[in-house]
């Protein structure tokens, strides 16, 4: 199970955001130093430890603020909600609350890149059988939020479960079997059978 951590940086100010630290603190710090980046925020797409294990250590090393959805049970300096904007330099990162995998799941839209955490993967979607999971909330998150975005949006998931590490919304809409048009009831039945 490969976890992905991402660094989003403004080229002019060198301010950066880390999306999902995972257990990669040393690697993240090295990349930030090598690229002369100032990590301003650590954003967790959800509270599961495989995405948040390094939050406190990275925050201590960089003085970055930890950001998570207000429903998240992890330590956070900044609580966010759907529609909030986190800004680094000229880059605006829009918070999209996407519950389903967990109550606190969020996706982050930065320009045409969507960091999906465990909400949507290449060719798959997040599990709903863990505490806080909800098939109806995942349906709404996928079909009423994510699928309303522009087709050229790049999907950058929290894990490498697919045939490739990233995709586009247009490709996923056409090829991801989870995203085939279904009613909420059909989706619930489909998810319970997989």
Task: List each language-model region with its residue ranges.
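Metallo-beta-lactamase
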Residues: 102-194
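Histidine-centered catalytic micro-motifs
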Residues: 42-52, 96-103, 155-162
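Active-site HxH/HxHxD metal-binding segment of metal-dependent hydrolases
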Residues: 2, 13-16, 21-94, 174-178, ...
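Short, compositionally biased "basic patch" segments
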Residues: 1-7
